Structure formats: structure tokens, C-alpha cells
From Swiss-Prot:
It comes from Lachancea thermotolerans (strain ATCC 56472 / CBS 6340 / NRRL Y-8284) (Yeast). Substrate binds at residues 215, 237, 261. Interacts with RAT1; the interaction is direct, stabilizes RAT1 protein structure and stimulates its exoribonuclease activity. The interaction also stimulates RAI1 pyrophosphohydrolase activity, probably by recruiting it to mRNA substrates. GO terms for molecular function: metal ion binding; mRNA 5'-diphosphatase activity; nuclease activity; nucleotide binding; RNA binding. Keywords: Hydrolase, Metal-binding, mRNA processing, Nuclease, Nucleotide-binding, Nucleus, RNA-binding. Its EC number is 3.6.1.-. It catalyses: a 5'-end NAD(+)-phospho-ribonucleoside in mRNA + H2O = a 5'-end phospho-ribonucleoside in mRNA + NAD(+) + H(+); a 5'-end (N(7)-methyl 5'-triphosphoguanosine)-ribonucleoside-ribonucleotide in mRNA + H2O = a (N(7)-methyl 5'-triphosphoguanosine)-nucleoside + a 5'-end phospho-ribonucleoside in mRNA + H(+); a 5'-end triphospho-ribonucleoside in mRNA + H2O = a 5'-end phospho-ribonucleoside in mRNA + diphosphate + H(+). This is Decapping nuclease RAI1.
Length: 383
């Protein structure tokens, strides 16, 4: 019988110290699924003058031409390939293994933290963990998550409007490099969710060091010729305008989740577009990530301590993973685990050799690419 462990979501860590996130690399992902390491070609720049709001921008225009790149079961949307390539490039440059205990995507860590605040019904956690070379690599299995089927439904229009807001509020190059013609025609640009720019960030909580990959929506102002542009990135969100008490409470819950998303990788700015019931963009508000905890504390008694509570749970769950899973430095010794959220606890179960997933996870490319495995073996020999 393999290893098995549970962590109840009421658990909190006494230690809540956070390490300042630092960017160690980035990559661009194309619609075709290519990963371009240390390439910023898919990075967007924020541009939405206040005068644009007078044009009654329709967040549903072009909906029938939307290039939907998610939901295809033949495309592994959860792959760690781009993240591993970027880490390998960093290690080749430094000639040492990246100092990390856990390597994954921000979205996965957000899911795990959200387990303390949501039920499994609304926050499904079904992850695979690989212990390799002294580190834990975590990913979701490749499962198609198709968008809402009815393209005329309110659900689909809400889904699309978020991508449309990103398209309307960003340009593909810094403003001085964009032609007037491109600026004037950008409202007609076809929306696509296949191109992505991913930052790779080193951070930590308590004694746990993490490397997290996270999609970046845009640069707010400018980029520097430095190795770390985190302070220039911004998160874009779009939601229905707030006009009632119930809507205010719903928006505050959204803000908490947005804060969680941004604080994990050190993104300091959130820009919210507010639309009306006809999906016309009515206003835009900018928030500092640092001000969100105080905003929630002053406005919603239920969320008074939510941000600090999230940090303490973050510390508890990472401590639990590191103490529960053996991590051998050898690049030859590999173990796989299934991590799920059931009722009121996270459940970790070792995947046995008899399991149908075992061979693909441990010996195949279910989590690690063969290129990355070979790189780590050669790095170990050279050190």
C-alpha cells in the first residue's frame, strides 16, 4: 500500500512569512502550441484612453468570429512544457538547479488555496504530483474544458466579454511603435484566446520555495531592460457593474479571488472593466493589489481576515505537501501522487505501478518532458 495523507481545510500555519516574488524568466505560447522561451512577442500593452468609454464599446461584437483555442481534447492545455523549457534555460545560464521545492502554475496553487474557502462542487481539484530530483512538480491532467455550448446564452456572452475587454484595452506593441491605422481599427480585431505570455516567478511562503508560471494580461506602463518586470504587469478583469448590495458582495468575493491570483506572483495592479446588462463597457477602475485586503476589511465583515487566512492556509498546505511526500535528490527516483479535494480535506494518494496512469506519469511525458529529465541528469553529473 502506497503513501496516503489528508489535510483538513481548517488547518492553518503559524508561519505566514512571504518571500518577495522575483521573475526568473518568461515565454510566449502561440495559438499553434509552440513555446518560445525568453520571447515577449505575445506580451500586450495596456491602452484604453478615457475617451474610448464614450464610444459605447460593445463587448459582444465579433462574438461569432471568436477563435476559441480551449476545449480541444487533442491539445494538452495543462502541459508544463513551456515552464520546464524556461526553467532549463535559467539553469543552463546559472549552471545550477533552480532553488525550488514546488514547481507548478499559479492557477493550480490558487485552486489549492481556494479549497479553504469553496466547496469541491465549485472548486474541483484533481491534480497529479511528481517527486523528482528533490522537487515536486504539479499539474492538472489534460481534460477538455469546453466553453458554454450555446453561443447566444448569457453564460457564453459573459465568457466572451472578458476576452473582448482584453482585446479592446491592449495593443501588441508599446504605443510609440503602433500606427494610427492600427489604433483606429483595433476595435475590429478578432478575439483569440490561444496566444499567451507567461511569466515564470520564484516566490515562497514560510520555508517553502516555489516556482510558478502565470499568464500575464498586459504591461500597464513600460518594460525595462532588466531581468524582472513584475512591477509593470497588470491583471485585466471584466464584470457586470455594481448597483445593488448583493452585487457589491459578489464583486468583493471576485476581488478576493483576483487578489489571490495577483499576490501569488507579485502582480501589483488590477484593472476592472464594468459593463451593463447589454454588455456595453461603462467604466474602468484601477486597483492596487496591496490595497485589496484593506478594501475587503472595510466593506465586507465576512472577508475581514480572508487575505491573512489565505496566506496561513497557503503556508499550511505547502508545509503538508513537503512533509508528506519523500523527495530524493536522485534524478532516477520518481514517485507519482494524486491530489484531490474531498468534502473538507485535501487527499494525497500515491499512484501504484498497477494504476493505468503510472507508466505515463513516471516513465512517460505525463508531467515531465524527456528533454527536461535528460537535462537534469546531465546537470547532476556536472555538479
Amino acid at each position: 500500500m502506497g503513501l496516503s495523507a489528508d489535510l483538513f481545510v481548517q488547518k492553518r500555519s503559524a508561519a505566514s512569512s512571504l518571500k518577495q516574488p522575483k521573475e526568473l524568466g518568461f515565454y510566449s505560447k502561440t495559438q499553434e502550441g509552440q513555446f518560445l522561451v525568453n520571447d515577449s512577442s505575445k506580451l500586450s500593452y495596456y491602452y484604453l484612453p478615457d475617451t474610448e468609454l464614450e464610444r459605447n464599446l460593445d463587448l459582444c461584437s465579433g462574438i461569432k468570429k471568436f477563435k476559441e483555442c480551449f476545449g480541444n481534447p487533442d491539445v494538452d492545455a495543462c502541459t508544463l512544457s513551456g515552464l520546464l523549457k524556461t526553467i532549463q534555460a535559467y539553469e543552463e545560464r546559472k549552471n545550477k538547479k533552480v532553488p525550488a521545492d514546488i514547481i507548478t502554475f499559479r492557477g493550480i496553487m490558487r485552486k489549492l488555496i481556494s479549497a479553504a474557502f469553496d466547496s469541491p462542487k465549485y472548486n474541483r481539484v484533481d491534480l497529479r504530483v511528481l517527486s523528482f530530483n528533490g522537487q515536486l512538480f504539479i499539474r492538472e491532467p489534460n481534460q477538455a474544458h469546453p466553453p458554454p455550448a450555446n453561443t447566444s446564452s448569457m453564460e457564453y456572452r459573459s465568457y466572451y466579454s472578458g476576452y473582448k475587454f482584453e482585446t479592446l484595452s491592449t495593443i501588441s506593441k508599446p504605443l510609440p511603435q503602433v500606427t494610427r491605422n492600427s489604433l483606429e481599427k483595433r476595435h475590429k480585431r478578432i478575439c483569440c484566446n490561444g496566444d499567451q505570455y507567461i511569466t515564470v516567478v520564484r516566490s515562497g511562503v514560510g520555508h517553502c520555495k516555489l516556482v510558478l508560471g502565470a499568464e500575464v494580461d498586459c504591461v500597464f506602463d513600460f518594460t525595462e531592460d532588466s531581468s524582472d518586470n513584475l512591477k509593470h504587469y497588470a491583471e485585466l478583469k471584466c464584470t457586470k457593474g455594481v448597483s445593488t448590495f448583493a452585487e457589491a458582495r459578489a464583486f468583493e468575493r471576485k476581488m478576493f479571488k483576483t487578489w489571490l491570483q495577483c499576490f501569488l506572483v507579485g502582480i501589483n495592479r488590477v484593472i476592472y472593466g464594468f459593463r451593463d446588462e447589454n454588455f456595453i463597457l461603462r467604466s474602468v477602475e484601477e486597483y492596487s493589489t496591496q490595497e485589496v485586503p484593506l478594501l475587503l476589511k472595510n466593506n465586507n465583515p465576512q472577508l475581514t481576515n480572508a487575505c491573512m487566512d489565505a496566506v496561513r492556509w497557503y503556508g499550511a498546505l505547502t508545509e503538508w505537501l513537503l512533509s508528506s511526500i519523500p523527495r530524493e535528490e536522485s534524478a532516477e527516483h520518481i514517485r507519482a501522487y494524486r491530489l484531490t479535494f474531498e468534502n473538507n480535506h485535501l487527499k494525497l494518494v500515491e499512484i501504484e505501478k498497477s494504476d493505468t496512469e503510472y507508466d505515463q506519469l513516471v516513465n512517460g511525458e505525463g508531467i515531465l518532458t524527456s528533454e527536461f529529465r535528460e537535462w537534469r541528469k546531465s546537470l547532476n553529473k556536472s555538479l
